[in-house]
Amino acid sequence: MTKTSNSSYLVILYYQYVPIKDPQTFRNQHFKYCESLGLLGRIIVAQEGINGTLSGPKEQIHKYIDQLKQDVRFCNTVFKIENVDAQVFPRLSIKVKPELVNLSLEEKVDLTKDKGAYLAPQEFLQALQEKDVLILDARNDYEYDLGHFRNAVNPNIRHFRDLPNWVKQNTHLLKNKKIVTYCTGGVRCEKFSTFLKKEGFVDVYQLEGGIISYGKHPETQGVLWDGQMYVFDQRIAVTVNQKEHVIVGKDYFDGTPCERYINCSNPQCNKQILCHEHNEHKYLGACSDKCSAHPQNRYLKKHNNKTS
């Protein structure tokens, strides 16, 4: 995290599924504007909309929000805002991609039509306590490992694009169930819940505003969430449950409670693993013997060691 003398910083997360006819031109103009405000972060622009997370001084973030909302396409965009004491991104990246989130479907789903009904945080809390409801985590395996809703189903996928195949292989688990999906901020569930409806599942819902909104809502305060929430910035993990903290993460090597993520020191692997500091040193920051012996091992380079 880039430290500064000013602690008045914000990080925002937002998305909007809305047609953007010329994503590249939009991207170029947007980059110049964000750069002029001194904002850092990552934004994806596609013909289907925008998905972004940015950090910067409070005044500049609010200028950005106000400016974006002046565009009729984004006048109803919901911004999830958190206070931070520094920039949480190293740089500004705005890319044009085919999809805001990659579900890799052969046929695109129409997000303007049938998608999972929204459950407000209070309604989601009620669903968490109902017996016949299937709570389905729509995030990646390393996100689930750090924290998740109690009794949520883990598809154990490495990438979001793996979810459709998981659904087809596990139809027996989902059939005739009330399915409630959740993700970090909601952008993945918009598309995933629409896919579920298209596949013939009728009783489909999604957590409105994602885990972030659930954790901050005064009536829910993140209850029945265990662990921490993985975020895609330099914080890596943030608190959701304001009532109690239950550690669910386990060290990759010894299985002890752990909430510290590292990337495998082999740059060609880069796998994220939960790992205590002493095990990082013991295993040279690598996830396997093969990776620890890699000639480009970053841990060894950092500590001026040589492979044996």
Swiss-Prot record:
Pfam families: Rhodanese (PF00581), Rhodanese_C (PF12368), UPF0176_N (PF17773). Residues 129-223 form the Rhodanese domain. PROSITE patterns: RHODANESE_3. It catalyses: uridine(34) in tRNA + AH2 + O2 = 5-hydroxyuridine(34) in tRNA + A + H2O. Keywords: Oxidoreductase, tRNA processing. Its EC number is 1.14.-.-. The active site is at 183 (cysteine persulfide intermediate). GO terms for biological process: tRNA modification. GO terms for molecular function: oxidoreductase activity, acting on paired donors, with incorporation or reduction of molecular oxygen. HAMAP family: TrhO. Catalyzes oxygen-dependent 5-hydroxyuridine (ho5U) modification at position 34 in tRNAs. NCBIfam families: PRK00142.1-3. Belongs to the TrhO family. This is tRNA uridine(34) hydroxylase. It comes from Aster yellows witches'-broom phytoplasma (strain AYWB).
